[in-house]
């Protein structure tokens, strides 16, 4: 297992709980002899920290491990910044669901001690790139660990578009939009729109129509290396948006083309040894268990 010496810390701003957890975490790591590097915005909320400070981009270049304190949204933002750096990322949950951030604050020190001693599970999670072109010229780009979503923005009108997968025409669709999700994102927005849950190790992409006008338009699961092309009808009277993880946005125009494909660089996500995807689904999604009723 990889030896961690230089550890970067990154936290969600605007939360007292996150700041307190960051202080605890920094003091613990320094006390254990690790070199701690704070992301610059994180350092601003920890006055008197007395450790090195770095930009988010450089954090991935100089650290052996980056620990993100916050919710899944915080880790999504970190993933987009760090995926190209080949640095492992670990999440401490200070949000609500915590599908990605699975170190608990109440057991943070013992769980971290296990991870730092080499007892952890590592996963590779792929991201999606989205390229927007207008009259053949690039006008926007974004990437997402969870999903790329075409939606009407502030408009209440449906969007008309043509869908192609690997150059093959799939259908013409009128709907509120389309969610193009990774397995990581299948338990997020795609799930609420009726998409399937995919195991994180699957090399697949799911396309989930949002309130389609044709009821036979159903979610489609395709190979993870597929190129997905959406041609926004030039007859539309609205300017749709392309959102990446719900955090970055590109405004499109009628006639634009959105091309979505797997990002070459992957996120290295690490978990404690007891990480169990199905246990997380039971806990976070309220799945029942016969064990809860005294079954075997």
From Swiss-Prot:
Transmembrane segments: none annotated. NAD(+) binds at residues 72-73, 146-147, 157, 174, 176, 187-192, 247. Keywords: ATP-binding, Cytoplasm, Kinase, NAD, NADP, Nucleotide-binding, Transferase. It is an enzyme of class 2 (transferase). One of its GO terms (molecular function) is NAD+ kinase activity. Pfam families: NAD_kinase, NAD_kinase_C. Its main location: cytoplasm. Its cofactor is a divalent metal cation. The keyword DNA repair does not apply. Its EC number is 2.7.1.23. It is found in: Cytoplasm. The active site is at residue 72. GO terms for cellular component: cytoplasm. The keyword Membrane does not apply. GO terms for biological process: NAD metabolic process; NADP biosynthetic process. It catalyses: NAD(+) + ATP = ADP + NADP(+) + H(+). Involved in the regulation of the intracellular balance of NAD and NADP, and is a key enzyme in the biosynthesis of NADP. Catalyzes specifically the phosphorylation on 2'-hydroxyl of the adenosine moiety of NAD to yield NADP. Belongs to the NAD kinase family. HAMAP family: NAD_kinase (MF_00361). This is NAD kinase. It comes from Hahella chejuensis (strain KCTC 2396).
């Amino acid at each position: 297992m990889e030896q961690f010496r230089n550890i970067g810390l990154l936290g969600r701003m605007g939360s007292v709980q996150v700041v307190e957890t960051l202080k605890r975490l920094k003091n613990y790591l320094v006390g254990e002899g690790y070199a701690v590097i704070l992301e610059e915005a994180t350092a601003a909320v920890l006055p008197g920290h007395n450790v090195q400070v770095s930009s988010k981009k450089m954090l991935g270049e100089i650290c052996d491990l980056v620990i993100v304190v916050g919710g899944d949204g915080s880790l999504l933002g970190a993933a987009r910044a760090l995926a190209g750096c080949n640095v492992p990322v670990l999440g401490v949950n200070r949000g609500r669901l915590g599908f990605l951030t699975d170190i608990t604050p109440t057991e943070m020190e013992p769980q971290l001690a296990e991870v730092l001693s080499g007892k952890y599970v590592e996963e590779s999670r792929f991201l999606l790139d989205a390229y927007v072109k207008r009259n053949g010229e690039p006008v926007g780009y974004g990437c997402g660990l969870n999903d790329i979503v075409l939606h009407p923005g502030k408009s209440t009108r449906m969007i008309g578009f043509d869908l192609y997968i690997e150059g093959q025409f799939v259908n013409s669709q009128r709907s509120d939009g389309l969610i193009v999700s990774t397995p990581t994102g299948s338990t997020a927005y795609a799930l609420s729109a009726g998409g399937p849950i995919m195991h994180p190790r699957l090399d697949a992409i799911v396309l989930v129509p949002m309130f389609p006008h044709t009821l036979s338009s159903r979610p489609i699961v395709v190979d993870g290396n597929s190129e997905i092309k959406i041609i926004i009808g030039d007859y539309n009277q609205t300017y749709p948006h392309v959102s990446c993880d719900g955090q970055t946005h590109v405004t499109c125009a009628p006639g634009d083309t959105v091309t979505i494909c797997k990002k070459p660089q992957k996120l290295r996500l690490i978990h404690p040894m007891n990480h169990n995807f199905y246990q997380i689904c039971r806990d976070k999604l309220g799945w029942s268990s016969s064990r809860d009723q005294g079954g075997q």
